[in-house]
């Protein structure tokens, strides 16, 4: 319960309320000290606007977290595959850092600039006990979006080996020599290209994910692709970084990457719509429309 007041006699009610709101212009010093919030312009419409912005901030944090956690799952899956399939890791540590501290940063921050969603003021108040990271968010991030990205990344890894004439049994036989860096130069070159493909696929999938995360409820077709231009700026910087990591000789040595064939780059174009369409279908299924 929120209570507004401006006089000395309102102080007890302002203290007892869940949220005490004192008038900034006409309110007394006693009322302002007793309140939780001071309404600087004495305009009650500002309270409504503040609530709407507060809900937008809460929603945007959830969008940000969904986006980040999804890529974490995609980064974790290659190491599960290494353990259970006895293959070399499809990502190396510095490539994971390139995603977490490089390519993911600006698109994630752009989600924090999303405007309040339509109908957000029609939703009931959240319970105090409701966690920010609840089960539906974690399931969506880890078990749906992240799992799809991880499977796509592993698909890219195996695709590079397959196009070079290796099946999974042969890859398992090479695992020990690759991990010890004792494999021949040709094998190591293929391995670096395969991990680079995994890295690029996950980054490309995150482009679809950032649009999917713009709303937990609404379709991207309703929101529009160009209503948050910061996302496009983030994607542009993201691809400048990832292409530099892939094609710069200096960065290749640091991140253990290799130049990708043009045909591999064309495959990356399929990744964003794969993630976005899958989440659009999930939203439609949940809404029942």
Where are these regions (language model features)?
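Membrane-embedded transport module
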Residues: 1-2, 24-218
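Phosphate/ATP-binding catalytic cores across multiple sugar-kinase/actin-like superfamilies
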Residues: 1-4, 281
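Acidic, divalent-metal-coordinating active-site segment for phosphoryl/phosphodiester hydrolysis
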Residues: 7-17
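Residues immediately C-terminal
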Residues: 9-10, 46, 283
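Hydrophobic residues within well-ordered alpha-helices
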Residues: 13-14, 61, 249
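C-terminal transmembrane module of polytopic membrane proteins
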Residues: 112, 173-176, 196-289
């Amino acid at each position: 319960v929120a209570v507004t007041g401006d006089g000395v006699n309102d102080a007890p009610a302002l203290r007892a309320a869940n949220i005490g709101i004192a008038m900034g212009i006409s309110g007394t010093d006693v009322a302002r000290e007793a309140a939780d919030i001071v309404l600087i312009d004495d305009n009650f419409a500002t309270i409504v606007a503040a609530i709407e912005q507060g809900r937008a901030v809460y929603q945007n944090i959830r969008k940000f977290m969904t986006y980040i956690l999804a890529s974490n799952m995609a980064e974790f899956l290659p190491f599960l595959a290494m353990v259970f399939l006895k293959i070399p890791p499809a990502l190396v540590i510095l490539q994971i850092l390139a995603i977490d501290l490089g390519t993911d940063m600006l698109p994630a921050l752009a989600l924090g600039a999303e405007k309040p969603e339509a109908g957000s003021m029609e939703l009931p108040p959240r319970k105090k006990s409701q966690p920010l990271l609840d089960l539906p968010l974690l399931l969506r991030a880890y078990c749906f979006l992240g799992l799809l990205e991880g499977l796509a990344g592993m698909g890219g890894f195996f695709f590079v080996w397959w196009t070079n004439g290796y099946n999974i049994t042969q890859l398992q036989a090479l695992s020990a020599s690759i991990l010890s860096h004792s494999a021949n130069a040709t094998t190591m070159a293929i391995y670096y290209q395969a991990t680079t493909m995994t890295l690029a696929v996950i980054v490309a999938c995150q482009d679809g994910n950032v649009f999917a995360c713009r709303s937990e409820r609404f379709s991207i077709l309703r929101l529009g692709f160009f209503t948050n231009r910061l996302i496009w700026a983030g994607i542009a910087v993201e691809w400048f970084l990832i292409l530099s990591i892939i094609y710069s000789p200096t960065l290749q040595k640091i991140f253990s990457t290799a130049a990708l064939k043009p045909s591999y780059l064309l495959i990356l174009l399929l990744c964003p719509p794969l993630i976005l369409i899958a989440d659009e279908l999930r939203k439609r299924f949940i809404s029942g429309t």
